[in-house]
């Protein structure tokens, strides 16, 4: 499994941030990781997006209105937040801090800008970049979903170019050639003791 070092490997790894371009397999890797190691706590994001059929408040997301989201931002209750497709998403700060204080490993699955905000708010966070094996494979994965219009796919690919260019801002890069192998590597990083 290819692992490449980036900004520095001496950060504590209890708060792990997983990021990478759309279509790289973040959700699939996280689902496998949680299946194997349910004690790794995955933060539940807050969103202004309406629930989709089958979604439960507090499970997939915490669903809030714009006024509540504005309050969370104003009172600095989010580690990071961003707007996507007209909806806002954010990571509640308090549950993350509670889990970390209890010594529980915490995983955040967020985008590049969210990862940057977490690094600014919590410099000890360990940032992991999930990269595709190749640009061609990323294009294949995004177009193969069959769930989005060509315009949306094009926007995602443009964003992916920006995200791939920011790879060196991360502490380590994992190349997603195999979900099981990359999950093994991610679990090893999460379990690695802090060097501080």
Curated annotation (Swiss-Prot):
Occurrences of domain Guanylate kinase-like (ranges): 13-191
Species: Thermobifida fusca (strain YX)
GO CC, any one term: cytosol
Disulfide bonds, paired cysteine numbers: none
Protein name, as recorded: Guanylate kinase
Family: Belongs to the guanylate kinase family.
Main localization, broad class: cytoplasm
Catalytic activity as recorded in UniProt: GMP + ATP = GDP + ADP
Chain segments annotated as transmembrane: none
Keywords for this protein: ATP-binding, Cytoplasm, Kinase, Nucleotide-binding, Transferase
Gene Ontology terms, MF aspect: ATP binding; guanylate kinase activity
Record region (Disordered): 1-24
Top-level EC class as recorded in UniProt: transferase
CDD domains cross-referenced by the UniProt entry: GMPK (cd00071)
Enzyme Commission number(s) from the entry: 2.7.4.8
Record: residues binding ATP: 20-27
Gene3D superfamilies: Guanylate Kinase phosphate binding domain, P-loop containing nucleotide triphosphate hydrolases
Protein purpose: Essential for recycling GMP and indirectly, cGMP.
Protein's cellular compartments: Cytoplasm
Pfam families cross-referenced by the UniProt entry: Guanylate_kin
